[in-house]
Amino acid sequence: MRIGHGYDVHRFGEGDHITLGGVRIPHRFGLLAHSDGDVLLHALSDALLGAAALGDIGKHFPDTDPQFKGADSRALLRHVLAQVQAKGYVVGNVDATIVAQAPKMAPHIERMRALIAADLQVELDQVNVKATTTEKLGFTGREEGIAVHAVALLVRP
């Protein structure tokens, strides 16, 4: 068994939606990023890579590489899974916490879980996503961006 932790942050910028867990969520801002800015999938990818001792997403998908400009983070997550599987691991479970003052995540969490489970080739009950605020404290509380913490458990079958 191996565990990994991932953390990612993206700041808000111009836009009319954000993408989290593969779900497009209407919002008065977008997230600034080289890829599609899916901070949830980036944190999950880092957790999986960390658990398998494969580095981080910056190593695998550098923001200096034009090939990843606007990249679909679901495709990146599936690529990460393939690397993890190549080392003989399968996903035991993943758990993520979205830290954001807005928008409200509750209406979107079940769809996020379903998409993540599909991409990771696991059952829905092996994926947990939750959200919290910082009670208007810090950069997330001032609605300057979104942060996500994620953990992953990998097992060898």
From Swiss-Prot:
Enzyme class of the recorded protein, top EC level: lyase
InterPro entries noted in UniProt: MECDP_synthase, MECDP_synthase_CS, MECDP_synthase_sf
Cofactors that this protein relies on: a divalent metal cation
Residues binding 4-CDP-2-C-methyl-D-erythritol 2-phosphate: 8-10, 34-35, 56-58, 61-65, 100-106, 132-135, 139, 142
Annotated catalysed reactions: 4-CDP-2-C-methyl-D-erythritol 2-phosphate = 2-C-methyl-D-erythritol 2,4-cyclic diphosphate + CMP
A Pfam family hit: YgbB
MF terms in GO: 2-C-methyl-D-erythritol 2,4-cyclodiphosphate synthase activity; metal ion binding
Pathway as given in its UniProt record: Isoprenoid biosynthesis; isopentenyl diphosphate biosynthesis via DXP pathway; isopentenyl diphosphate from 1-deoxy-D-xylulose 5-phosphate: step 4/6
Site feature (Transition state stabilizer) residues: 34, 133
GO terms (BP aspect): isopentenyl diphosphate biosynthetic process, methylerythritol 4-phosphate pathway; terpenoid biosynthetic process
Residues bound to a divalent metal cation: 8, 10, 42
Cofactor binding comment, as recorded: Binds 1 divalent metal cation per subunit.
EC numbers on record: 4.6.1.12
Keywords, alphabetical: Isoprene biosynthesis, Lyase, Metal-binding
Highest taxon, organism lineage: Bacteria
Record CDD domains: MECDP_synthase (cd00554)
Assigned protein family: Belongs to the IspF family.
Subunit description: Homotrimer.
Purpose: Involved in the biosynthesis of isopentenyl diphosphate (IPP) and dimethylallyl diphosphate (DMAPP), two major building blocks of isoprenoid compounds. Catalyzes the conversion of 4-diphosphocytidyl-2-C-methyl-D-erythritol 2-phosphate (CDP-ME2P) to 2-C-methyl-D-erythritol 2,4-cyclodiphosphate (ME-CPP) with a corresponding release of cytidine 5-monophosphate (CMP).
HAMAP family: IspF
Protein name as catalogued: 2-C-methyl-D-erythritol 2,4-cyclodiphosphate synthase
Organism field: Stutzerimonas stutzeri (strain A1501)
Lineage: Bacteria, Pseudomonadati, Pseudomonadota, Gammaproteobacteria, Pseudomonadales
Gene of this entry: ispF
